[in-house]
Regions:
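Short boundary/loop segments of OB/S1/cold-shock single-stranded nucleic-acid-binding domains
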Residues: 9-25
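Bacterial N-terminal signal peptides
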Residues: 1-7
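Short aromatic-glycine-enriched beta-strand elements
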Residues: 37-48
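Short, structured beta-strand/loop micro-motifs enriched in basic residues and often containing a Trp
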Residues: 60-69
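Short, mixed charged/polar active-site loops
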Residues: 26, 53-56, 110
Length: 118
């Protein structure tokens, strides 16, 4: 029984199952919401152009404690902020992605958050 629990826990944390680790796309738009929640923070963006134009795209980030360690705060991203986020997209084409080894541009300021790197 403990073997099956380990397998489930391992699968939960496998980004490779949900996201394409090879492909990277840029999501550009305005922040709708920045969710500072465990186990991972998320930012939701109304997409301005490209394949997801007019849709809200969800981006998975690191944990609140990891982001805070890197200087982030729960108020870093505000609704209406212009962002460009490089993400590893969903394997099934859903409007969701993972920000790992990504570049984040907030209102024209480029940053490469250390905490989101492999």
């Amino acid at each position: 029984m403990s073997l099956s629990i380990v397998a489930v826990a391992s699968a939960h944390h496998s980004a490779a199952a949900s996201y394409d680790a090879v492909e990277s796309i840029a999501i550009k738009g305005k922040v709708v919401e920045f969710a500072w929640t465990n186990p991972h923070c998320h930012v939701y963006v109304d997409v301005a152009d490209g394949r997801f134009k007019g849709r809200t795209y969800g981006v998975e980030l690191g944990s609140p404690s990891a982001l805070a360690h890197d200087g982030w705060t729960r108020t870093l991203l505000q609704p209406g902020d212009d962002v460009v986020i490089e993400v590893h997209p969903s394997r099934v084409g859903a409007p969701v992605g993972l920000c790992r080894n990504c570049t984040l541009t907030i209102n024209g300021k480029v940053t490469k958050p250390r905490v989101l790197q492999d």
